[in-house]
């Protein structure tokens, strides 16, 4: 397998645990995978909560400078696809009553449902509140703002002026002349761009497989044990079939792959 992958110039080894980079334009629905981007650092910051309270939390900062989407699974199971030239900041552990993150730039959020823990996104001029849904956000320093909802419902509020709107699936809200404007989403396929070229940086195999499998329901990839699921991996996929994804993961982690019906099983 190595000889074939190496011949096609699909592998790059980096340090211990191989960094696998593949650029095959194989048609496979909406899935594409990619890795190696942005950097992550963990530090202690002052978190300014609504109401003026200050909390001292360990915040993680994800910064993406690459063209492909940087995919991160948060503590609650929510998945964030961070676009190029964008930054996401969130606490290492969420508070008991809320899940609050800060976004500068563009991202697609697939938020895990939890009615007891509201999910909040702080941007420059707008605050976004959700319980469980999927949507994209574009918020830039030039005051431009745009949010489209794929499923569920989102509440968007201006920080100055107090205007709020509820955005349902199939709707888009923009900020124009300091007012939130609601309209129908023009391109229903705009969400596909976030899953076509994705990468993972130091993510658990379990979280990687959850994202990958969501794009290929007819052929699922599974780890044979919980120990394997906890293995961390930096890897990139780009328009790869499930078989190729499994093959690349096996190469990166020195695993074996076997097929059992509609499942690809990864084992040591």
Language-model-detected regions and their locations in the chain:
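Intrinsically disordered Ser/Thr phosphorylation hotspots
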Residues: 1, 31-33
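A short, acidic loop/turn at secondary-structure junctions
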Residues: 1-13
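A residue-level detector for the "anchor" residue at the start of short, highly conserved motifs
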Residues: 12-17, 22-31, 38-268
């Amino acid at each position: 397998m190595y000889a074939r992958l190496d011949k096609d110039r699909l592998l790059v080894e980096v340090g211990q645990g191989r960094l696998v980079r593949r650029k095959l334009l194989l048609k496979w629905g909406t899935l594409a995978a990619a890795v190696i981007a942005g950097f992550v650092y963990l530090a202690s910051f002052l978190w300014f909560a609504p109401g003026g309270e200050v909390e001292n939390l360990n915040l993680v900062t994800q910064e993406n400078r690459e063209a492909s989407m940087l995919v991160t699974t948060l503590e609650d199971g929510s998945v964030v696809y961070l676009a190029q030239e964008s930054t996401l900041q969130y606490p290492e552990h969420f508070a008991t009553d809320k899940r609050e993150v800060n976004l500068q730039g563009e991202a697609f959020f697939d938020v895990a449902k939890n009615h007891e823990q509201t999910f909040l996104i702080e941007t420059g001029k707008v605050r976004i509140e959700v319980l469980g849904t999927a949507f994209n956000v574009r918020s830039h320093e030039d005051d431009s703002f745009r949010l489209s909802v794929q499923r569920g419902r989102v509440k968007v509020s201006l920080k100055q002026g107090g205007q709020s709107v509820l955005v349902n699936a199939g709707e888009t809200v923009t900020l124009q002349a300091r007012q939130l404007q609601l309209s129908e989403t023009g391109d229903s396929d705009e969400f596909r761009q976030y899953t076509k070229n994705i990468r993972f940086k130091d993510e658990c195999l379990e979280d990687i497989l959850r994202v990958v499998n969501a794009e290929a329901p007819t052929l699922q990839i599974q780890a044979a044990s919980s120990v394997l699921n906890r293995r961390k991996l930096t890897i990139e996929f780009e328009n790869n079939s499930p078989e190729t994804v499994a093959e690349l993961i096996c190469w990166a982690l020195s695993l074996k792959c076997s097929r059992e019906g509609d499942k690809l099983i990864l084992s040591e």
